[in-house]
């Protein structure tokens, strides 16, 4: 299992919208994530800095990357693009984090 962590951001006045849209996420999106090998997916919000910290365990990098090509993921990105910085393809602007410590 691969562990992935990343940082995104949310617009300062959109914290509540971001949280509401994730509780719960669309059932079809949850199904795609699970079917593509995503486990233990969490997102944490730092309200003071408008930062989102994501953590997910994936079965393979290729399966994780394939999620972006699904129709439901494309719709989700568009749905979220008004509450967070997004790339031209509507994917969230994100930065992968480098692992520095792990305790099993």
Swiss-Prot record:
Biological role stated in the UniProt entry: Involved in the anomeric conversion of L-rhamnose.
Annotated Gene Ontology cellular component terms: cytoplasm
Subcellular location: Cytoplasm
Summary of subunit composition and partner proteins: Homodimer.
Source organism per UniProt: Pectobacterium carotovorum subsp. carotovorum (strain PC1)
Keywords: Carbohydrate metabolism, Cytoplasm, Isomerase, Rhamnose metabolism
NCBIfam families linked: YiiL_rotase
Taxonomic superkingdom: Bacteria
Residues the entry annotates as binding substrate: 18, 41, 76-77
Keyword field contains Signal: no
UniProt key word Cytoplasm: yes
Pathway: Carbohydrate metabolism; L-rhamnose metabolism
Enzyme class: isomerase
Any GO BP annotation: rhamnose catabolic process
Protein name per UniProt: L-rhamnose mutarotase
